[in-house]
Amino acid sequence: MNKKIIYGFLLVAFAVVGCKSGENKEVTVEPEQSVSVAKDSVVAVEKTEASVELVDSTKLADNADKKSYEKVIVDTLIDGVKFKRYYFDIRTDELADETMLVLPVDGNADANKKIIDRLLDDYSFDADSIQQQLEAQFDAYASGNFAEEGDDYHESELLVYPLAVVDKKYVSYMLHSSLFWPSEQNHPQWADVYFMFDLNTGEIILQDDIFDASAENRQAVGVKIHDELVKFAGNEEDIFAEAGAELLNASFVFDDKGMTFFYQPYEVGPYMLGEPEVHLSKEWLEPYLKKDGILYDYWFKN
């Protein structure tokens, strides 16, 4: 993956989280149901990926040059909804580049296109020709016709995959992007961003679709999040974000039990805190929800 594209995303990711309130054979795999947004649903996806047979994989290896390439394009079923998984792994003396995109292909084609365009907006991919674009880039590397002149050895990752499908109506996504130049950096630069989408419309779900518009209610949720962050950190001094509605960021997911907010390094506290997560139960959130909103309808009217 071109480093300029990755750098662009890393910059955009921090801005968004900080400011916004060949021939394909098919195989379907039914994964274990996820039981927790923050941890177990990620594990469920990992189990799903591990259990999918690599039925259309291409592996090229040249031991003399220490080059290795892997390409996988396969259909997979996650919580009853079909996705297509694209996996491209390139390892040479100059770079290590891993790309995995797990994208919706079930149901409404226009909705799927909206989701894909939103997820890959910072990567110059076209939803209508994404496979051709990925294969062209992979083939260029594999044939030795692609070079990033002047670069030292570097590593990059772009992983975009669903954490869970919720009630076959909504899908939560994680987008992980990282870059690392060992000769220049002590650790990788990375960003993890989370999204919720309506599978029927392709629209991204925002805070305004969930919470009551009153400032008092949103302030109360923000104060609760701050309290949970303090518990996570162990003391209030390590949380420099103020208690309030500003903590209701755009990086969140939900499931049948509640809602989880995710924060980037340095967003709410020092680097040593990592990426804090705050889970709020649906029972606690009920008084603050928009009564005609998505979550109130899903949690309390079904």
Give the predicted meaning of each segment:
Residues V12-A13, K231:
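Generic detector of low-complexity/intrinsically disordered segments
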Residues A15-G18:
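C-terminal motif of bacterial Sec signal peptides marking the signal peptidase cleavage site
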Residues K3-L10:
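Sec-dependent signal peptide recognition
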Residues L10-L11, V27:
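Enrichment for repetitive, rod-forming helical segments
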Residues G22-N302:
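Compositionally biased intrinsically disordered regions enriched in Thr/Gly
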